[in-house]
Amino acid sequence: MKTTINYYGYDTLLQPTDWRAAAAVVGLCKYFDHFRIDYKILYNVDEKPENYIHGFDGIIYKSDSITEEKYLDFVESYFEKYMTHSTILSILGNDEFSDEQIKMVNDLVKSKTVLKGLLGKTKFDGTNKAVFISTIEENREEIIKTIFKNGNNLYKNYCNERLIFTDDNSTCRLRGYNVDKDRKTSIIGFCFSKESFDANDILEFDFIPFAFSNPDMRETYFVNNNFSVETLVNTNRAFSEQLSNTEGKGDKNKLLLVLQNSKDYISYDVEIISKSQDDAFYSTLFVRLERLKKLRELSGKSLYFVKKINDDYWFNLEKEVYMRCLNNVLLDDVILKMFKFFYFEESEKKNSKAISEIRKTQKNIMYKIGLLVDINVSWKGYDIMYEITSAKKYGEMVSKELIKKSSNNKIKSYQQKIISALCAHDYDRAKEVILSLSAYVGMEFSFFYKFLENAEENKDIAFAFASALTETNSKNSENND
């Protein structure tokens, strides 16, 4: 929340009472530090302003220290990598130019509408650099502002580009919060009264783009742990650095990997705000410490498995497990999906000569299913680990017994029947199949009684048993295909 104050020459207090104000605080701190502008942190002053909000830290500053000229200078410095004119000036700093450099300058001019409008009629030939330098310098602020506000990964991703460095707006400038004032606005307020709608827009929201992580990522993040200004700034700095140093496909995967290794700077419940260039709104992920600890426990698990479903979607097991962990969702559906992948590979055997590769993939899938079952049971907190271990052991024993009887085909048959029943949530059928198998091999399954008591709640026992039914004797299994 922004408050006007009268405090020893300072006239403004901004407190991180919501994520927008918190992100603005982080961006402003970077701005003030860049220009070495004096400001104070609320928690660090003994005498507080009269009308501050208790329970929140904040920054105390002079409103006139925020000017458009300084703001654009900061933009140019902070997002230098995306400032096309800076790249051009860097090239023009040379005394001589290669054909490649000449072509690059002309291509860079064409790449931005504002530069094309200023220099499009003049082609760089290596002898007229003075014209290019003077034109850029004379129109520097216009160039910076236009490139920044129209950049899909810059201001435009976060705010309505028409509202950059404006004040007293009727609605908030942020994407997802902004309303077109030229259209009917009665529907946005309570009881169709636009007067009841709180726009809550401040100039300081223009500093929000500086608070989010790595602009080279399609989806960027802001960690709203607003315990104090110091933790806000330091956490987001560390978070952004870790994202930059983390290898992995997909921004969401990077986020999850960074969260796994964030114990040095995230040790309590936090809110993470994300903004994707594909969306016209912000998203929120609330990370509870309890779930974060469980996520960190997964760091030693071998969960890497990807499978192409169609041109637009790849199933990523690691991502699926991590997101369910954070959102406190169980893995039942993921386990069933992995079983379906196993049978898809089985059907591919008929159409492929690479039988050994398919067997290798199937073995990997079953290993992953075993891990998923253990994780699932630990999340549920059910005391059935003894039965899970027993089910896996009996699955291996049954497989060996069937191979001894030269009944390898029965392994696949019973396994498929059990999984088909579980996928259909037909637990009576699953019980029948397991009882039939018990009678066929002449073994009493001690784990089975727990499954009989409550099949829905204890289906992980059946998952574990089915995943352990494998043709362990590869030579025999080859002969029985």
For each of these PLM feature ranges, what is it?
Residues T146, N150-K184, G189-L203:
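Long amphipathic alpha-helical coiled-coil/heptad-repeat bundle
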Residues M1-F124, S134, F286-D481:
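Long, contiguous all-alpha helical interaction modules
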Residues K103-T171:
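A broadly conserved sequence feature marking short terminus-proximal activation segments
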Residues I143-T146, R173, N224, T231-L232, ...:
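Generic hydrophobic/packing signal
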Residues N178-F339, Y343:
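Domain-exit/linker segments immediately C-terminal to small folded modules
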